[in-house]
């Protein structure tokens, strides 16, 4: 049976259809917003997965190119692995949903959001979060708290709900807010240096607008939602919990109070070894339960330390940033390098400058077709002192790379100001919390070292949160380290400049964040950011005046778009000859902007000269240095510009009478000539006599 429900959000219809498609899924819905449509299927395993200590939720965001009327490129002509954007969108759906499942729920759950139709005014990634929540709420899976998502734009001083494509172009803010009825669950933002108070008001605006979508979901559930199954929730047996607590709590507490990281880890390893020795014979089938009991006690000790004792594991004040180190120019042959160290977290970012032709071409369902600035993030096992096979980037690495990329995007100079493709690679050398924000700082250092004229330096910091079980007590922490991230309740990453915020990413392990926590985290991040920016400026106060001598040399020139065909030539003959003769790369835009780049500046100069010659118009009255190409009885033919030839009649060759042309010039000679006339057929008449006369007059005046 097909059920439908509809509402209006920001003047556009939002609709859900349930029961028509995917009959064998626990719940399958078709959810639309305008002409953007997402098919969402959710399913859960019948039984919990044995031997695990986590909730096995997987979220897939599947892009279908037919949704935008495209056929995939390449030989195979079908969608391949998910695009980076699809991976990021999948992560964004996962983060607000995961904390709202019951604690101890270990059934495998899969949420698949398939994008089947896209209208550019209505972003599929925002609709997908709402669709995932709606499908889970309508299903028999024990998920009962609706989550809503909206995008907030800012044009002038006005907040825009779910901005259209045109409004997004004008907006200085791209903010996604996910919320339940009571609290904010997730924040993603990119902005053009947005002031803190404006960002807080934008989040409040988004939270309020989420309530209409939550009401819409609740109405749908009351009308045609399935009855919820009673979940089989995993809980550590009371007997085991009490036994482990009695044996190990004091040892765990003592170990967790050690401020030095290595000593603390060594002490905890000893405690765990003693626990295993004590209980492995008595409870051989419950070692994962024992591990969970130890984790819960560690978390309890850390919470007590922070909330009741007012101490952090490493002895810092709640608003204190770890020691900062900044260095540039480490690698001799790269175009720019930045090394950023914060405590035991260390990231080296390397900048590479390339020609405009080296932009990344995107083949996806989004409006963006190419990227000129990109940031990649690598997190090898050695950064945490572990041994693992080296593989390609995972979802986390793609997410962290995109976050640091977004933080600096508003500060990158335009193509006209800086005609280079820019690639940054952040290598995490040591990780003890907040490597993504260390990558922002390392990227700033590398860009400045590479001579990229960024608008202003940027820095990032991660704020954390510790709460009591009933959420009545809350403490916001500045610059969380690994332990505080692991046992904490929030990861609130903020990057920006002295002027304002350029990116935010927030996720939580609890059922949402209060208004006070968001306010304190944003303003606490500003205080820390300004301190880090001072350290960056001490290291390198401004971009280097010139790019590295190893970077490609680039020049731009504007030509008449009508002349593009002259530069390219029939079948690319002319442009290919220029490239072959000078060793340059040439990129020509439709508006006639030409980019010429090469490792050698001489090649660039030569190519620019040729292109200028090909596109420059010969003007009557102008004097040119031309080359004699051919001699006839009646005069000499002279090339004044590439492929532009004129005739110097024998009577115009010299001030005195000339009997034979060869008496004055030979083929290959370079001579000054003046354009006396361009006739109706485009023929160019030249005079050497007039050019000599003008030159003599100029000499007399000097």
UniProtKB/Swiss-Prot annotation:
It comes from the Bacteria. It comes from Clostridium perfringens (strain 13 / Type A). Signal peptide: none annotated. CDD domains: KH-I_PNPase, RNase_PH_PNPase_1, RNase_PH_PNPase_2, S1_PNPase. It holds the Pfam family PNPase. Residues 621-689 form the S1 motif domain. Belongs to the polyribonucleotide nucleotidyltransferase family. It is an enzyme of class 2 (transferase). Involved in mRNA degradation. Catalyzes the phosphorolysis of single-stranded polyribonucleotides processively in the 3'- to 5'-direction. NCBIfam families: polynuc_phos (TIGR03591), PRK11824.1 (NF008805). Its EC number is 2.7.7.8. This is Polyribonucleotide nucleotidyltransferase. Gene3D superfamilies: GHMP Kinase, N-terminal domain, K Homology domain, type 1, Nucleic acid-binding proteins. SUPFAM superfamilies: Eukaryotic type KH-domain (KH-domain type I), Nucleic acid-binding proteins, Ribonuclease PH domain 2-like, Ribosomal protein S5 domain 2-like. Keywords: Cytoplasm, Magnesium, Metal-binding, Nucleotidyltransferase, RNA-binding, Transferase. One of its GO terms (biological process) is mRNA catabolic process. It catalyses: RNA(n+1) + phosphate = RNA(n) + a ribonucleoside 5'-diphosphate. It is found in: Cytoplasm. Its cofactor is Mg(2+). SMART domains: KH, S1. One of its GO terms (molecular function) is 3'-5'-RNA exonuclease activity. Residues 552-611 form the KH domain. Mg(2+) binds at residues 485, 491. GO terms for cellular component: cytosol.
